[in-house]
């Protein structure tokens, strides 16, 4: 995937990060889509505010780019509390976590992205903090080492993961609120593109907004990234506004087709067809064949390809569908058994 459009890419330059934050909704009213999740969260937040309690620990899971981080920030805003943000891979030692927990004020939100990547020792350390709002820390070392219990202010842990199946059962059980975010339809993404273009003060036609939305893989983060790139083309190659012609020109230049598939998506499909006769093929073998990590294929590319019906998982591996053959203009070879 073009790194400018990759929903997992964390290597944006400072200007891109600022723009991404600028486009993020700050309240429930500004957030588009995920209606059932949103309605439930509104009730949970109102009830917590009414009782003056910390919101129950909350887990958001689903493909990248659908709004998990945005919703964590919205929860803090709607609760009227502070938020501290970190990620699973960053928390190497219990001491890293202790520093965050002891600096939380009452009812604050601690957001841990990629929570499935917490180390086992840090995860176990988190259990007592989540359940009892207490942690035990070791003072000194050697024969003088002793454990001291520290009381924490009641807080809300918000976890986000793209791979909920990797969460341990004890960790999952400690989240009182669990919400799965779904891919967006084109209509909702069109609304998001129009809202973002308004914030960016970039005029856009309805046709162009629909075109960008239709190629955004059902993902708001990709829709906003595409909009920013199309805006670049509009300012340099166009007349400073986004119409259907400049939108198509820009998206084609970015190698994003009408289905939202990019070079790597099509490479995956072509590889399964050309090298493995349509499949089945194992994930690690496929990853080697396309020079991409298994994790990236499984987290970034595969969910959308399955959602859109281009590939399917079977007990023996990945297989392409008839839709993939039609999309690529290929004819499925007839494979017959027997000796003759």
Swiss-Prot record:
Cellular localisation: Cytoplasm
Binding positions (DNA): 313, 318
Region (Small ATPAse domain (RuvB-S)): 185-255
GO cellular component: cytoplasm; Holliday junction resolvase complex
One of the record's GO molecular function terms: four-way junction helicase activity
Keywords, in A-Z order: ATP-binding, Cytoplasm, DNA damage, DNA recombination, DNA repair, DNA-binding, Hydrolase, Nucleotide-binding
Gene3D superfamilies, A to Z: 1.10.8.60, P-loop containing nucleotide triphosphate hydrolases, Winged helix-like DNA-binding domain superfamily/Winged helix DNA-binding domain
Region (Head domain (RuvB-H)): 258-340
EC code(s) of this entry: 3.6.4.-
Keyword DNA repair in annotation: yes
Predominant location category: cytoplasm
Binding site for ATP: 23-24, 65, 68-70, 131-133, 174, 184, 221
Region (Large ATPase domain (RuvB-L)) residue spans: 1-184
Residues that, per the record, bind Mg(2+): 69
GO biological process, one term: DNA repair
Catalytic activity, as annotated: ATP + H2O = ADP + phosphate + H(+)
Coiled-coil stretches: none
NCBIfam families recorded: PRK00080.1, ruvB
Subunit structure: Homohexamer. Forms an RuvA(8)-RuvB(12)-Holliday junction (HJ) complex. HJ DNA is sandwiched between 2 RuvA tetramers; dsDNA enters through RuvA and exits via RuvB. An RuvB hexamer assembles on each DNA strand where it exits the tetramer. Each RuvB hexamer is contacted by two RuvA subunits (via domain III) on 2 adjacent RuvB subunits; this complex drives branch migration. In the full resolvosome a probable DNA-RuvA(4)-RuvB(12)-RuvC(2) complex forms which resolves the HJ.
Cited HAMAP family: DNA_HJ_migration_RuvB
Membership in a protein family: Belongs to the RuvB family.
Stated name of the protein: Holliday junction branch migration complex subunit RuvB
